A protein has these predicted regions:
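PAPS-dependent sulfotransferase catalytic core
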Residues: 1-100
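Conserved small/polar residues in nucleotide/adenosyl-binding loops
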Residues: 136-137
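Secondary-structure boundary elements
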Residues: 87-88, 116-124
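Active-site glycine-centered loops adjacent to acidic/histidine catalytic or metal-binding residues
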Residues: 133
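Well-ordered, non-membrane alpha-helical segments in soluble/globular domains
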Residues: 71-80, 105-117
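Short, surface-exposed linear patches
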Residues: 28-30, 114-119
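Extended amphipathic ligand-handling, pore-lining, and cofactor/metal-binding catalytic surfaces
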Residues: 126-129
């Protein structure tokens, strides 16, 4: 079954290194039927390698108000990207450190929306999370 891997980076667990590895090794991943797609749109102050940011990203209007319509537009573009990648690869990997932070906040409903999309488009979702042992802090 096609699988969407969602890497939710907890603090100090090498999320940036994992993202950079995936970007730099795209050809190797592709040969194994994995894709780490880069979005064709960007969020201000968010590194391009954070391809899962559309799941929880905030967008603001020039006056500082949240732009819910734009957030929905980017959500739909991000899902369309996943669907396109599944036409070529069996596995798609997304990663963003804000997913961890947003899982307890106002953006939490994205999980239900993502699971609904997975059901409608016949893929499964697996979450990857690394936890840093407190003894190392």
């Amino acid at each position: 079954m096609r699988t969407l891997y969602v890497h939710i980076g907890t603090p100090k667990t090498a999320t940036t290194s994992i993202q950079m590895f995936c970007v730099e090794n795209q050809k190797v991943l592709n040969k194994q039927s994995y894709s780490y797609p880069l979005l064709d749109f960007v969020y201000p102050h968010v590194a391009h390698r954070r391809n899962g940011h559309f799941l929880v990203g905030w967008v603001y209007k020039p006056g500082g108000q949240e732009d819910v319509e734009k957030e929905q537009e980017l959500w739909e573009k991000g899902l369309a990207m996943i669907h396109q990648e599944f036409e070529k690869y069996d596995n798609v990997i997304l990663s963003d450190e804000n997913i961890w932070h947003s899982s307890n906040g106002r953006k939490f409903p994205f999980w239900a929306k993502l699971m609904q999309d997975a059901k409608e488009h016949d893929y499964q979702v697996k979450v990857i999370v690394y936890i840093l042992s407190l003894i190392h802090i």
